[in-house]
């Protein structure tokens, strides 16, 4: 009889019993090999019966890798060894199940502590980060609104400064025009002053000439009066002479009238020019004073606006610095949060991977356990036959006889028993179906 159980897609087991029955004796040879956890299970049986002698030979390879040779001894010792090793294997399986349950409990506790879900279906839970993200969004919106308001105020201040700059340029042009007019009026005033000086000089000249004429006239009158006081006998044969007194009086009257007319004309012209010039000077002085006051007011307004502009620029710079710092802080916080999220996702992925690996390993162990249990059950059935019994922790074997129990006579016929086990497994070494076929053939003795 030969039996081989190993991991594969499909296995067939054959138990040919080659031997001869002679007399009442029964002989059996047993070779069994069982690999460790995760490997197959193989057994080979051969039996022969001759004469009146009964001999039993049994050899079994151990369940571990270290024992690779064949063991010899009687069947009871071999079965006891197999039972001990099977108990050790079951203890190892139970320890692995306990370790797996412990790991599952730890994984479940970790998920209960760090996130909702179960070991079979886990979802990302970022609900605890939502309030922080909403707060950061609100702060960003508030900062953006403040920045927009500051930019709007800066633009308004810039437009106001541009308007005042235009007004200042217009007033400066008006001031320059007024100064040019004042300079022109000053030149006119200088010309009028020169003309007045000339007129005064002419007046003085005419006054001196008049004084000189009066003095000459007085001297001539005195000379004529002195001459008239003496005895002068003049005989005139010519026509009567011209009266000099009348002539001088006429000349004096003409000169006085001419001087008076010139004086009146000069005074009238001077008064007219002085009045118009004085009126123009008064108007120009008033305009100059008004322009000077307005210029002073514009200078004061310009200084105020410059101070306000400087304060707004300083406020803008401080707001820009604050905005830059706030953006940097928020970027740093977002980067830290993103790094934490990435780390948590990586940990979650690692835990999932480990869980899947442990799940697959656990399933493989369960499949191996079921496979080994079925193989052990089949092994017990093959060893004990129809009368054999197999338990979870210990196995008892009985003598398997072909034909009648006890000693067989030499003349009994030769019997060949063939037991075939068909087992179908999938790719994960999971047993799908198991079938056991027993065939018995009889033949004549030699």
From Swiss-Prot:
Residues 1-74 are annotated as: Head. Residues 111-132 are annotated as: Linker 1. Keywords: Coiled coil, Cytoplasm, Intermediate filament, Keratin, Phosphoprotein. Signal peptide: none annotated. It holds the Pfam family Filament. It is found in: Cytoplasm. Residues 387-446 are annotated as: Tail. Residues 75-110 are annotated as: Coil 1A. Residues 400-410 have a biased composition (Polar residues). GO terms for cellular component: cytoplasm; cytoskeleton; keratin filament. There are two types of cytoskeletal and microfibrillar keratin: I (acidic; 40-55 kDa) and II (neutral to basic; 56-70 kDa). Essential for the proper assembly of type I and type II keratin protein complexes and formation of keratin intermediate filaments in the inner root sheath (irs). Plays a role in the cytoskeleton organization. Belongs to the intermediate filament family. This is Keratin, type I cytoskeletal 25. It comes from Rattus norvegicus (Rat). The lineage of its organism: Eukaryota, Metazoa, Chordata, Craniata, Vertebrata. The gene is Krt25.
